[in-house]
Regions:
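Conserved phosphate-binding elements of NTP-dependent enzyme cores
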Residues: 1-948
Length: 948
């Protein structure tokens, strides 16, 4: 086998026909500036080809069901193994996916509980054992003497059909009576059942009267019934109750039998185990009165009912006015002045009481109705169920909240399933443990000799999988945590742990920044995991910017030298020491500290005002009070799972945004937020896409395209032709090419081959029709402008201040290499975040804006971080406030103020460990952040002195 993966002539995206030799069975880091071509090499070339070759080995029939990969633009690749990509984009948002199900730990738990779980009665809690025939006889003999009994075996339960064969079989076996749907019938009568109705059929085995001496006959009849009824017998007391006995599991005291205990019973995705009320979701989404009526001091006319406030002339408002008018109120009456009964009418409906409604409809027709008022909440529920529009559905969901299912209280499973325990814990209690707690629980579990034999293999798998999750720094996650709530880094590390669990050898793993979201403290464990995967006999290609990972790598490939068109070349390749010596490598310059991010000489003190969160206790936060100083650059730090995102995103952002705007979802639990009067805007700049379709691009998102279209409409040619700005939009009829509807490309479906995208034959990919493209500004068409990079745009629009301002800020945030018309779907998370940042920077500062960023360094090289920090510091210099959640020490050391949460993750986190300047935090021994910050601040002083 070859010792190298040899790539020849890679040209995907911006790669410049490069050749690379990657050593096999080694840990290889691919690094470089954001947009330099790292992912193009690792994912779009090497992974795509490895995956494509594997899929090509399957039949054409199988291929049509698999995600097809295009053949990458490369001459050839040798020495390639089957490739597995572990990226951050494939997080499941299915509400049924949990940490337990994704890691397959839940599958082993289901098996363990089914095989060695101890059943209890869901009603009285007593341990349940299987009933013997003797116990059944004793139970029946305790009934009042002379009670008449029917001993029956059920053979059909709730099935459609005429069941003629079944009835004929009963007749042949010599039985005289059957009970069909509760009615006892002589088997020799003509029985015609409705074909499309569900029927239940029991064979009457014997008829008895309770008295002394019948025990033997009763036992024989029970045994026959148990044999026919698969371990279950029904005893009908004539004119009395129906008793059920089971050879399987049943509570003798309560008369409750459990079905046969099988792994599927413990699955909340199976009808055998799922709570019937919520179908195993554990929650209900419903309209929340606090979101529908966020400010109860308002009147209906002032927007009391938020979902109805957008259209004050709607029929719903006419109805509300009619209800109020009847009782002497108006739309201008404040809510707290309206009688409680009338409030109830408005919220939940008037029942039978009717009202007169009169209004003019959209056709100017006068209409009158006399009917009850259904109520605002039922009206919203009805509209939500009836609408076919995704946009309307999404707008309604902004007023809904998720509440635990009233029946299972969020447990997702049936009561009889939750009554089965191991070590006095049911499966829900085990999955509510953190991974660290679950690992400890299983280590201390004691089994009988028989149980030990049964559980041995299952326990081995559980210990291994929990151990791998501990190794990648996820001990704070609970097994019941929804997969959709995980960050990209957490989801990636879970998949990494799952891969280690699979124990494959000779595989090519390609990872995308596995250190994201991981505190410096946990880095060594992650690196040990990566090395373990390598030592099994696998090749790891890791796209990464983290210095610790580079020092641990066997080989580093630095792609660059710049981003976009200025990148796509191999600048340097070798060990970390060789990269440090390479003067052309920007990575080497930062590793050797020839370049570095300086520690500020002094920290800002702020403007004296604060935003204070009081009594934060969502998730693991321990009722803490946190002050955020305004006018400074604040970084919230702490180990993974310490409560940073909960505090900043769920409480601070949602709490403030719900007061300033209408937002989706409720803020996390807290008492109050003080100091809201000191800000007028709060903006969360996250890494979600700037648009979900290729029609969204940086020019449309920032709003600069409006000014560009305006500029083109002012040219002489456009004025002569009467073209308005709308003519230069590729989204509407008029100026766009109608053959491709302004996309520039046409999709051709190839069924079991990948879909092919070809340039539109009419416009040749220009998006516009010929007439529109005849209008030029400085020799360029509107299509040429969309194909310009930001750097080119800066030069081209230098004399148009309105446009140049946007170009300059896009350049300042390090996006000079992207095209103005680059589809949003091709931008990375980090690029999308910086487009949003530029969009905000281009606006005039009010000095009262609070910006929130969650791990903005994701996907950024140290050089990009340097540039990003300059931009964030500019925002603060303008009087605004920036709050960042971050693990990157280069960002942490440049902050004015730090809030360090911890000390650990999960239940052992959620408190403030330290707060103050980075220098203050470095002195706190209990702070993990401080421990790593201290040497960095000392190094910063030395470097500042060196270059002074």
């Amino acid at each position: 086998m070859s010792d190298f993966i040899t790539v020849k002539g890679a040209r995907a995206h911006n790669l410049k026909n490069i050749d690379v030799k990657i050593p096999r069975d080694k840990l290889v880091v691919v690094t470089g500036l954001s947009g330099s071509g790292k992912s193009s090499l690792a994912f779009d070339t090497i992974y795509a080809e490895g995956q494509r070759r594997y899929v090509e080995s399957l039949s054409a029939y199988a291929r049509q069901f698999l995600g097809q990969m295009d053949k990458p633009d490369v001459d050839y690749i040798e020495g390639l193994s089957p490739a597995i990509s572990i990226d951050q984009k494939t997080t499941s948002h299915n509400p049924r996916s949990t940490v337990g199900t994704v890691t397959e730990i839940y599958d082993y738990l289901r098996l363990l509980f089914a095989r060695v779980g101890k059943p209890h009665c869901p009603k009285c809690g007593k341990p349940i054992t299987q009933q013997t025939v003797d116990q059944m006889v004793d139970n029946i003999m305790s009934l009042p003497e002379r009670s008449k009994l029917l001993i029956m075996a059920q053979i059909i339960r709730g099935k459609k059909g005429e069941h003629k064969k079944v009835l004929e079989q009963i007749r042949k076996e010599g039985y005289v009576r059957v009970r069909i749907d509760g009615e006892v019938i002589d088997i020799n009568e003509e029985i015609n059942l409705e074909k499309n109705k569900k029927h239940t059929i029991e064979v009457v085995i014997d008829r008895l009267i309770v008295r002394e001496g019948i025990e033997q006959r009763l036992a024989d009849s029970l045994e026959t019934a148990l044999d026919i009824g698969e371990g279950i017998v029904y005893v009908q007391v004539v004119d009395g109750e129906l008793l059920m006995f089971s050879q399987n599991f049943a509570c003798i005291d309560c008369g409750i039998s459990l079905p046969e205990i099988a792994p599927r019973m413990f699955s909340f995705n199976s009808p055998y185990g799922a709570c019937p009320e919520c179908s195993g979701l554990g929650s209900h989404q419903q309209f929340d009165i606090d979101l529908v009526m966020p400010n109860k001091n308002l009147s209906p006319a002032e927007g009391l009912f938020a979902p109805l406030s957008k259209n004050p002339a709607s029929y719903a408002m006419v109805q509300i006015e009619a209800v109020l008018k009847k009782y002497g109120y108006t739309l201008n009456t404040p809510w707290n002045e309206i009688d409680k009964n009338i409030q109830e009418y408005l919220i939940n409906g008037s029942g039978e009481e009717r009202f007169n409604y009169s209004y003019v409809n959209m056709y100017d027709e006068y209409k009158e109705y006399f009917s009850p008022f259904e109520g605002v909440m039922p009206m919203l529920e009805r509209r939500y169920k009836e609408t076919n529009s995704d946009i309307m559905r999404e707008s309604y969901e902004a007023y809904m909240s998720t509440t635990p299912c009233p029946k299972c209280k969020g447990a997702r499973l049936k009561p009889e399933v939750l009554s089965i325990t191991i070590g006095d814990k049911n499966i829900k209690q085990v999955t509510d443990m953190t991974i660290a707690e679950a690992s400890e629980f299983f280590k201390n579990l004691k089994f009988t000799e028989r149980e030990e034999i049964i559980a041995k293999q299952i326990m081995k798998e559980l210990h291994a999988r929990l151990g791998f999750l501990l190794d990648v720094g996820l001990e704070y996650l609970t097994l019941s945590r929804a997969a959709g709530t995980l960050s990209g880094g957490e989801a990636q590390r879970i998949r990494l742990a799952t891969q280690i669990g699979s124990g494959l050898v000779g595989v090519l793993y390609i990872l995308d920044e596995p250190s994201i979201g991981l505190h410096q403290r946990d880095n060594n464990r992650l690196l040990a995991t990566l090395k373990h995967l390598r030592d099994l006999g696998n090749t790891l290609i890791v796209v990464e910017h983290d210095e610790d990972t580079m020092y641990a790598a066997d080989c580093i490939i630095d792609i660059g030298p710049k981003a976009g068109a200025g990148g796509g070349e191999v600048v340097a390749q070798g060990t970390v020491e060789e990269i440090k010596q390479n003067l052309d490598s920007i990575t080497g310059q930062y590793l050797s500290r020839r370049k570095y991010i300086p520690v500020p000489k002094e920290r800002r003190k702020g403007n004296g005002n604060f935003i204070e969160v009081v009594g934060a206790k969502e998730n693991n936060l321990k009722n803490i009070n946190v002050k955020f100083p305004l006018g400074v650059f604040t970084v919230v730090t702490g180990v993974s799972g310490s409560g940073k995102s909960t505090l900043v995103n769920e409480i601070l952002y949602k709490g403030l945004a719900s007061k300033l705007y209408t937002i989706k979802g409720k803020p996390g639990k807290h008492k109050e937020i003080k100091g809201i009067e000191n800000i007028d805007k709060i903006i969360n700049i996250d890494q979600s896409p700037i648009g979900r379709t290729p029609r969204s691009n940086p020019a449309t998102y920032t709003g600069v395209f409006d000014s560009i279209r305006e500029l083109f409409s002012q040219t002489n040619e456009a004025k002569i032709r009467g073209y308005k700005p709308g003519r230069f939009s590729f989204n509407v009829k008029g100026g766009r090419c109608e053959a491709c509807h302004g996309d520039g490309i046409i999709k051709i479906e190839m069924h079991f081959l990948p879909d092919v995208y070809v340039p539109c034959e009419v416009c040749k990919g220009a998006r516009y029709n010929r007439e529109t493209l005849e209008v030029k500004y400085k020799g360029k068409t509107i299509s040429d402008v969309l194909n310009m990079t930001v750097d080119e745009g800066c030069v081209f629009f230098e004399n148009i201040p309105k446009i140049y301002r946007y170009m300059k800020v896009l350049q300042d945030v390090g996006l000079g290499y992207i095209q103005l018309g680059q589809p949003a779907t091709t931008l990375s998370g980090g690029e999308a975040q910086r487009v949003k940042l530029a969009s905000e920077l281009a606006r005039r500062s009010t000095g009262k804006t609070l910006y929130i960023l969650d791990e903005p360094t994701t996907g950024l090289h140290t050089a990009d971080i340097h540039q990003l920090l300059d931009v964030l510091q500019r925002l603060v210099d303008g009087g605004d406030t920036v709050v960042v959640i971050e693990h990157n020490l280069d960002v942490i050391k440049t902050a004015d103020y730090l809030i360090d949460l911890g000390p650990e993750g999960g239940n052992r986190g959620g408190t403030i460990v330290a707060k103050g300047t980075p220098e203050d935090i470095a002195k706190v021994k209990a702070s993990y952040t401080g421990q790593f910050l201290k040497p960095l601040l000392e190094e910063g002083k030395r470097l500042n002195k060196r270059d002074a």
